[in-house]
């Protein structure tokens, strides 16, 4: 099994983050990766806002993950 990892500088604009993630995911798929991991959620923290990760979470049926399916043809 080929595993790919992607990393990028996370912004506060989820749409931009989603576009970058989709691009990285497409690159992994083009190289026949079976699993693609993004560690960014582990880094999404703010010392002044302990709930940032929870507040930033996206629904599985939402636009953020829906964008991946559109860009990479994954459902």
From Swiss-Prot:
Q: List the disulfide bonds.
A: none
What are the transmembrane regions? none
The UniProt entry, under InterPro entries, shows: C-N_Hydrolase_sf
Role according to the record = Pseudogene resulting from a nucleotide deletion that introduces a premature stop codon at position 66. This is the N-terminal fragment. The intact protein (AC A0A140NCB4) hydrolyzes deaminated glutathione (dGSH, 2-oxoglutaramate) to alpha-ketoglutarate (alpha-KG) and cysteinylglycine, has less activity against alpha-ketoglutaramate (a-KGM) and no activity on glutathione or L-glutamine. May function as a metabolite repair enzyme.
Report the gene name: ybeH
Show the Gene3D superfamilies listed in the entry: Carbon-nitrogen hydrolase
Question: What family, per the record?
Answer: Belongs to the carbon-nitrogen hydrolase superfamily. NIT1/NIT2 family.
The name under which this protein is listed is Putative protein YbeH
């Amino acid at each position: 099994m080929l595993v790919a990892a992607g990393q990028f500088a996370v912004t506060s604009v989820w749409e931009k983050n989603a576009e970058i993630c989709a691009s990285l995911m497409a690159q992994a798929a083009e190289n026949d990766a079976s699993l693609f991991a993004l560690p960014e959620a582990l880094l999404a923290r703010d010392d002044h806002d302990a709930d940032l990760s929870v507040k930033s979470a996206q629904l599985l049926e939402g636009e953020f993950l829906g964008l991946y399916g559109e860009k990479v043809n994954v459902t």
